[in-house]
Amino acid sequence: MSLSPGPLTPHGGGFSTWHAYDPSCKAELWSTCFSSNQGTVLFDPINWPKGTPLPAAPVRIVRTNGNHDRSCAELAARTEGQISATVPGFTALPLPGAGEGETAFFHLPSGTWVVGDALIHLAPHGLMPLPDKYCTNPALLRQSLRRLLDLPIRRIFFAHGDPILQDGLERIQKLFP
């Protein structure tokens, strides 16, 4: 993958994002970074922003689904990081019905949810579930997303779209009245 992402954008609480448009899939690809005193987690990473120091070790790299290889292997090599399906301090939330292996990650202390393709937040449509044509089972995905309505979600970081930095749960509830 050879993209030219913009700089890291900090969002507080250790979370940052970076993104770039990928002409091969005609979509804006977003990546999320979480940094703490225990190390760094990169969710669905695309190319690391040029001119930005590499993240602090230890580095854990997480794919939210089977389609998000992106720059995982390259960044694992550059940072001596580990590609992993688990993240200490985050709850893994499988979301059957989206793409293969779709799993979101919830960080309870900050009320932050990191999601791959199950929900997208792109103009001009705004927040919406993954379109049916990309789902393995659209009805099951909607059922999976409804389970999240019990979580105290404040912020949402996406693999496709601008983050929602407040009132995350309220935004999801509007999708499932």
Model-derived features: where do they sit?
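Metallo-beta-lactamase
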Residues: 2, 6-9, 13-17, 22-24, ...
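Active-site metal-binding motif and surrounding structural segment of the metallo-beta-lactamase
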Residues: 47-86
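Extracellular/periplasmic metallocenter environments
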Residues: 88-91
